[in-house]
């Protein structure tokens, strides 16, 4: 009888009658958030510790800079919670989340089961309850058995609920090719097409540590303020990269930007040549800079 009463009520609700109704935006409504305040200076110094504060004054590789950025983000936003395989006690497969569990505790740096569906499901549940989750998928190849958590649940819920419910999150995913001689079908996964096919999803993929920091800050802002879902693809091959053109040149180490972010409509432009334009991202940008140097020096093409 209860089900029948509910059905009788629902059947009288307005239906989608026009093409505009059917094609309504999947993007959830923005929400007003209090402007975050900078963490107390003494607390920040205590949280980072002397060694990392000292390292912050020198150029670093991408893995270290992402670690700095996540520390600052968690200091600034108390509702940010991270979850994933080995991200806490171990500090991540590549050390990207090193010391974060010691800094913020296991309730904000959650070591999960080796199950990507559970990781993303936990993120969805936390988002429902006012948190800003940052789930980590250990390798892009591991996402595919759980991608319906994003396509069928998180990304489409705002549309299905007419904006009443949302699942804002920043999904960090280590991916792209990174190891010579290791099959591309397993850990070395470059299959971004499945993410591009998810309506309403934002994909971000930095090529260097400085951009990674600025883009991660913007991704968190988009999740908090605009209730968006962002797939933040981190190129494994660039995590520890130090050099660009030759051994020891330190051309891929960058200073930690204390402030600022990169908005979605910003692009990076390198060089002022007029002969050729190379458009790329992630690992491709790094390799394109090397190719551009060869083209200019050996073929006088800029």
Which functions belong to the PLM regions below?
Residues 131, 300-301:
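Short phosphate-binding/catalytic loops that engage adenosine nucleotides
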Residues 23-229, 233-239, 245:
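Thiamine diphosphate
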Residues 21-26, 291-293:
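Composition- and surface-driven signal marking solvent-exposed, interaction-prone regions
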Residues 1-23:
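Active-site or pore-adjacent capping/gating segments
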Residues 65-73, 214-229, 238-299:
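Glycine-/acidic-rich phosphate or pyrophosphate-binding loops and their flanking alpha/beta elements
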